[in-house]
Amino acid sequence: MSTDKTYCGFIAIVGRPNVGKSTLLNKLLGQKISITSRKAQTTRHRIVGIHTEGPYQAIYVDTPGLHMEEKRAINRLMNKAASSSIGDVELVIFVVEGTRWTPDDEMVLNKLRDGKAPVILAVNKVDNVQEKADLLPHLQFLANQMNFLDIVPISAETGMNVDTIAGIVRKHLPEAIHHFPEDYITDRSQRFMASEIIREKLMRFLGAELPYSVTVEIERFVTNERGGYDINGLILVEREGQKKMVIGNKGAKIKTIGIEARKDMQEMFEAPVHLELWVKVKSGWADDERALRSLGYVDDL
């Protein structure tokens, strides 16, 4: 019987919207799992990413950005998901952006002060700071906010110092059996990952034109006789005008979204994919908690 020790633990990645949490997770895992886009609030579910290296297994919880506005049902549920992630982990990575400090950062910090888990502060996008002389005083300001386990300036985009974060994580994993097989990257279903890929392309190609009132349901996900997948995706928007926006002139926009989403799916699933997309108006879904539950927004709370 093998007596080799193994180490395993949960790590929450927290921070206000759009500071680079998903990009950091993807870099830590070495591949794209969490949806990344320049728009705030693109992560809506607690995606678990798993990184196994030898005896070490780090299980990352990628939270929605904690933010102060809680007006709509979807925002309330996103905040609840983020707060619940903080409560049951061995370690927290708190991501902030360059020399910016906002009331939202302060709110996240206050939640962390109440927690028991040690906190690594990841100061992201330091490569984008114009006035380098401002960086050191800002790092000192951050160091005075709470007793951080470590403060690491990083660039999640380029990967700078991400290995330092990974090293600190490994050191703090408790001795435990691995929760997942070593080839697992995420515990989310392929159906869920397909919907996230489509949603990322919507964010990417529609940019600021489309509000957050868009979601994706996978209505069909089956293996075909060619050894690939037939996937039907339903894009839900709140208004007729948004539907036209998603479809684009003579269907050009939805065609581009479909082509790019299919490429990513084929890479992730390592199999040919036949993807069909439809757009449907379902008004008020972002305000209706029952509708959100039916779309899986609270399946993990």
UniProtKB/Swiss-Prot annotation:
Record region (G3): 62-65
Gene3D superfamilies the record matches: 3.30.300.20, P-loop containing nucleotide triphosphate hydrolases
Region described as G1: 15-22
Keyword Magnesium in annotation: no
Predominant place of localization: cytoplasm
Residues binding GTP, per UniProt: 15-22, 62-66, 124-127
Membrane topology reported for the UniProt record: Peripheral membrane protein
Region (G5) location: 154-156
CDD domains: Era (cd04163), KH-II_Era (cd22534)
InterPro entries: G_ERA_dom, GTP-bd, GTPase_Era-like, KH_dom-like_a/b, KH_dom_type_2, KH_sf_prok-type, P-loop_NTPase, Small_GTP-bd
Keyword Nucleotide-binding: yes
All residue ranges annotated as the Era-type G domain in the record: 7-175
Database matches in Pfam families: KH_2, MMR_HSR1
Any one GO biological process: ribosomal small subunit assembly
Keywords: Cell inner membrane, Cell membrane, Cytoplasm, GTP-binding, Membrane, Nucleotide-binding, Ribosome biogenesis, RNA-binding, rRNA-binding
Function as written in the Swiss-Prot or TrEMBL entry: An essential GTPase that binds both GDP and GTP, with rapid nucleotide exchange. Plays a role in 16S rRNA processing and 30S ribosomal subunit biogenesis and possibly also in cell cycle regulation and energy metabolism.
Family that this chain belongs to: Belongs to the TRAFAC class TrmE-Era-EngA-EngB-Septin-like GTPase superfamily. Era GTPase family.
Subunit annotation: Monomer.
Protein name (database record): GTPase Era
Source species of the chain: Salmonella paratyphi B (strain ATCC BAA-1250 / SPB7)
